[in-house]
Amino acid sequence: MSLNAETKAAIVAEYAQSEGDTGSPEVQVALLTASINHLQGHFKAHKGDHHSRRGLLRMVSRRRKLLDYLKGKDLARYQDLIKRLGLRR
């Protein structure tokens, strides 16, 4: 259920702060958001897949923590990221 390499590379290129940046909070949140959106389609077809749902909740929690970190560090970057990803917060 993971993203393919081309999709990941495109997301990293779009949200990276500098060349080769894969660890900034923006990139991590964007990758988690893409994975979460990908898994939502899986759960529409497989409602009883509770094992994968636990992984989804873990990803959502990790994204929430990264967003909270970014909000405390730099509010402008946080608001820009929320707007670019279309998250409701």
From Swiss-Prot:
One Pfam family from the record: Ribosomal_S15
Domain of life: Bacteria
GO biological processes: translation
GO molecular function, one term: rRNA binding
CDD domains tied to this protein: Ribosomal_S15p_S13e
Key words, A-Z: Ribonucleoprotein, Ribosomal protein, RNA-binding, rRNA-binding
SUPFAM superfamilies assigned to the protein according to its UniProt record, in alphabetical order: S15/NS1 RNA-binding domain (SSF47060)
PROSITE patterns: RIBOSOMAL_S15
GO cellular component, as recorded: cytosolic small ribosomal subunit
Family: Belongs to the universal ribosomal protein uS15 family.
Record note on quaternary structure: Part of the 30S ribosomal subunit. Forms a bridge to the 50S subunit in the 70S ribosome, contacting the 23S rRNA.
Function summary: One of the primary rRNA binding proteins, it binds directly to 16S rRNA where it helps nucleate assembly of the platform of the 30S subunit by binding and bridging several RNA helices of the 16S rRNA.
Name of the protein: Small ribosomal subunit protein uS15
